[in-house]
């Protein structure tokens, strides 16, 4: 059985699915907004962005968070620093030019929440708003790291 879908949007390719469930393209995929990200070898730290033939170099801090981006002429096109919870401050350039925030987090441009595969993190409150996938096994379903050094020290001293 072959299924086909046609989109009413202009210049969209026709998608068809064969009897084995494989998607087949009939036409060229539009590449108007194609973005290629290059990562540091063996990590998730972005080091470059390629868009519309233009190459950008990304500089990250010691935590792997992007802090600057330069075009091929060496001009700064994006720059930001972060507060203690990872929220952007003092941003220069288009905010979502680089959507990566804390390592492994991708900022949703509509909600300004950071997505971590299974959860959403709100940098304005410094906590996750989605439950931990391991639920109560982590002892706090929305915790982002150790919040209290004193509680950690007391826990260590007791045991």
Predicted regions and their residues:
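Short strand->helix junction
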Residues: 75, 135-136
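Short, low-complexity export/processing leader segments characterized by acidic and small residues
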Residues: 68-69, 87-89, 119-129, 133, ...
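A motif-centric feature for acidic-aromatic and gly/ser/thr-rich catalytic loops and repeats
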Residues: 48, 52-117, 151-152
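Conserved active-site tyrosine of GNAT-family acetyltransferases
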Residues: 39, 60, 80-82, 121-122, ...
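Activation loop
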Residues: 35, 98, 117, 140-143
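Short acidic/glycine-enriched loop/turn segments that link adjacent beta-strands
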Residues: 110, 139-140
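Acidic/glycine-rich beta-solenoid
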Residues: 1-55, 73-77, 90-98
């Amino acid at each position: 059985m072959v299924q086909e879908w046609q989109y009413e949007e202009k210049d969209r390719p026709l998608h068809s699915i064969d009897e084995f469930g494989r998607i087949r393209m009939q036409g060229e995929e539009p590449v108007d907004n194609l973005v290629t990200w290059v990562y540091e070898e063996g990590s998730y730290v972005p080091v470059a962005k390629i868009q519309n033939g233009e190459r950008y170099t990304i500089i990250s801090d010691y935590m792997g968070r992007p802090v600057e981006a330069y075009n091929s002429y060496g001009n700064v096109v994006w720059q930001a620093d972060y507060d203690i919870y990872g929220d952007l401050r003092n941003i220069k350039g288009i905010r979502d030019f680089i959507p990566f925030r804390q390592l492994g987090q991708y900022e949703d441009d509509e909600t300004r929440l950071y997505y971590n595969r299974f959860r959403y993190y709100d940098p304005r409150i410094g906590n996750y708003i989605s439950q931990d996938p391991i639920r109560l096994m982590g002892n706090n379903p929305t915790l982002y790291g150790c919040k209290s050094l004193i509680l950690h020290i007391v826990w260590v001293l007791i045991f």
